[in-house]
């Protein structure tokens, strides 16, 4: 515990905010190239095959990112846009791929929450 004199001389050190998506380096999104597209299994109470991709970003950082929605067209060397946002039951996955931009097509036959999945308005 510091004395009052020490606080007057030095003061308190302010806490630094820790970023939840450090690889984006304060950008809202970042572009990258898929190096590996694969499926992985979630943590304990859940069971599924979640689609994920390893992406090398334009700043040289390689991250694991989640591919949302039903079905995708991504493969190695696909150029994708990454946004922040973790997947709770996949450890180490802190980013989402933005559907409907660059090489990633929107989800087919999507009626609700279309903007989140890059789906066009049905006729």
From Swiss-Prot:
One of its GO terms (molecular function) is structural constituent of ribosome. Disulfide bonds: none annotated. The modification 3-methylthioaspartic acid is found at residue 89. One of its GO terms (biological process) is translation. GO terms for cellular component: small ribosomal subunit. Keywords: Methylation, Ribonucleoprotein, Ribosomal protein, RNA-binding, rRNA-binding, tRNA-binding. The keyword Ribonucleoprotein applies. The keyword tRNA-binding applies. InterPro entries: NA-bd_OB-fold, Ribosomal_uS12, Ribosomal_uS12_bac. Gene3D superfamilies: Nucleic acid-binding proteins. Pfam families: Ribosom_S12_S23. Part of the 30S ribosomal subunit. Contacts proteins S8 and S17. May interact with IF1 in the 30S initiation complex. HAMAP family: Ribosomal_uS12_B. With S4 and S5 plays an important role in translational accuracy. Interacts with and stabilizes bases of the 16S rRNA that are involved in tRNA selection in the A site and with the mRNA backbone. Located at the interface of the 30S and 50S subunits, it traverses the body of the 30S subunit contacting proteins on the other side and probably holding the rRNA structure together. The combined cluster of proteins S8, S12 and S17 appears to hold together the shoulder and platform of the 30S subunit. Belongs to the universal ribosomal protein uS12 family. This is Small ribosomal subunit protein uS12.
């Amino acid at each position: 515990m510091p004395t009052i004199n020490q606080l007057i001389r030095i003061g308190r050190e302010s806490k630094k905010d820790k970023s939840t998506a450090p690889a984006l380096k304060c950008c809202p999104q970042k572009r990258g190239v898929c190096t590996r597209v694969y499926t992985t299994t979630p943590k304990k109470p859940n069971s599924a095959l979640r689609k994920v991709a390893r992406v090398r970003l334009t700043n040289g950082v390689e991250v694991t990112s989640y591919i949302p929605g039903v079905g995708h067209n991504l493969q190695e060397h696909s150029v994708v846009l990454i946004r922040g946002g973790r997947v709770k039951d996949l450890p180490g996955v802190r980013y989402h791929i933005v559907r409907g931009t660059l090489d990633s097509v929107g989800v087919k036959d999507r009626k609700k929450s279309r903007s989140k999945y890059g789906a066009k308005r049905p006729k």
